[in-house]
C-alpha cells in the first residue's frame, strides 16, 4: 500500500508564485498582468472603438478640413480640435467603463455554515444541514431578502446579481453591456452613463457641422440643396450614420436619466415594477443624482495582482495499486460551479497474500436499492464472511453447479 502523489506542474518554482488573476474562477479576461479586467466578450470593444473613430476620421478629412476655408483660422482649427478632443474623451470613458472592476464580490472557497436543519428528528434518522435559499437582512432600517448563490457560495447583498456571462456576483448590477464587453455595476456605472452621453453629443456635433457644410456649398455655388448634397457624399453618409446612432445612444441616455432619477437599475426596472412609494432605494431626484455622480466610488474588493498560495490539490488517498478515481476532478468542478457533485470513489486492494478484493465506498441507500443483501455483502468497513474454520489464504473454487450454469450461458 502506498500513497499516489499528484503530478507536479512544471514552470512554477514556489508555492506563492501565482497572482489572483491567474487563479480567477470567473470568465473574465485580464490584460497587463491583472491591471485591466474585461468581460469574456471583450472583442466587441474593438468594434465599438472603430464605430467611434472611423466616422470622426472621415469627418475631419472630408468635412472639417473644408470648413477651415469658410471660417477664420482660429474657428476652422477649433472645429477639428473639438472633434478630436471629444473623441479622445469619449474613448477614455469607454476604457474606464470596460477595463475596471465593476464591483465583483469575491466568491467563497467553501459554503457558509448552514443555519437550519432539514430532516426528521426522530431516533435513528440522520439530520441533513441545508442552507436556506433566501434570508432576510436589515439594512438602514429596511428589510431586504437576499438569495444564496450556488456558484459563488455566498449570500448576495441587496441589489447584487450574478452575471451569467462573466460568472461573477456583482454589486448594484445594472446589466452586461456587449458593446463595452463588461458588466455595468456599482464601480463603473458613472463612467458608462458619461460615455453614452458624450457619444450622443459627439454624434450631434458631427451631424450639425455636416449640415453646415452642405449649407455652405449651397450658398457659395447658388445651387439647390439636393445638388449640394450630391457634391459631398461623405457628409450624407455621416448625417445618416449619426442620425441613426443618435436615435439609439440618445434613447439610451434618456432611459438611464430616468433610472438615475428614480434610483433604479436596468435589472430592477425589467424585473420589478416599482412605483414612487415602493422603491426602497429612491431618495429623491436630487439625492439620487448625487449618489451616482458625486458619491465616492467604493474601492475594489479584489486585488488581482496580489500573490496567493497555489491551491493544494485534492488530499492524496491511501490507494492500493496506484489508482485514483477519475471522477474526483469532476466533483471539484461541480462544487465550484454550484452543482451538486455525486460520485463514488473506488479503492482497489492488492494485498500481499494474493487476494484481490475490491472495496467500494458507496452509499448504503444505493446498495439497498440494488439488492437488500448487497449492503451486507459489499461495505467499505466489512469483509466477505468466511467460515470460521476456513483458512485465510485458501482458494475459493466454484461449485460444479455454478460452473455448469456459466458454461450453459456461454
UniProtKB/Swiss-Prot annotation:
Protein's name according to its UniProt entry: Probable protein S-acyltransferase 6
Function of the protein: Palmitoyl acyltransferase.
Domain remark text: The DHHC domain is required for palmitoyltransferase activity.
Membrane topology, as annotated: Multi-pass membrane protein
Family note: Belongs to the DHHC palmitoyltransferase family.
Ubl conjugation listed as a keyword: no
Domain annotation DHHC: ranges: 147-197
Region annotation (Disordered) ranges: 108-129
Sites bearing Phosphoserine, chain numbering: 325
Disulfide bonds: none
Keyword Cytoplasm part of the UniProt annotation: no
Cellular compartments per GO CC: plasma membrane
Keyword terms, alphabetized: Acyltransferase, Cell membrane, Lipoprotein, Membrane, Palmitate, Phosphoprotein, Transferase, Transmembrane, Transmembrane helix
Active site: 177 (s-palmitoyl cysteine intermediate)
Cell compartment(s), UniProt: Cell membrane
Residue ranges of the TM segments: 45-65, 76-96, 191-211, 235-255
EC number annotated for this UniProt entry: 2.3.1.225
PROSITE patterns, per the entry: DHHC
